[in-house]
Amino acid sequence: VVPKERKLQLNAKPYYQLIEIKGTAFERGKRYGSSASGAIKRNIDFYSFAFEKSANIDWPQAQKLAMKFLPVIEKYCPSYVEEMKGIAEGAERSFEDILTLNCRSEVLFAKADACSCIIIPEGRGKNGHVFIGQTWDWMASARQNSVVLKVHQEGEPSILMICEAGMVGG
């Protein structure tokens, strides 16, 4: 029996909240976190349940596992760390909560996702621009906690993506 507080609307029809963010990585994250705080909480509840059911670990154990990935993320993508810190502050959650959401695949599975990627090379797309896309082949029940995120990064291409609330990317 699933406790009342753990029951998720698995058949809920998703709608996607559009969140547009700009500024430094931390500023983008803070705006994103405050705009999606309810969905982030639901996403944490969702993965807490998923970790228990699929990996037989509780949320604090998942956080400890996720922390093992932090040095690599800091080394290769420090802006993601800053964005996650901003999300945590904006959503009034711990950094560990947001990091754990972003390491959910690594915590749940030791295999690659089944997502597909596509690229339209320079000169072949509209206005000659490069376009990159990826499918989202994940648990359908996670859609209810997803948002459409429009990211404006200084000196970098803008990004429009569907992502689970609290996730960074780009």
What are these regions (language model features)?
Residues 1-170:
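N-terminal mature-domain region immediately after signal-peptide cleavage
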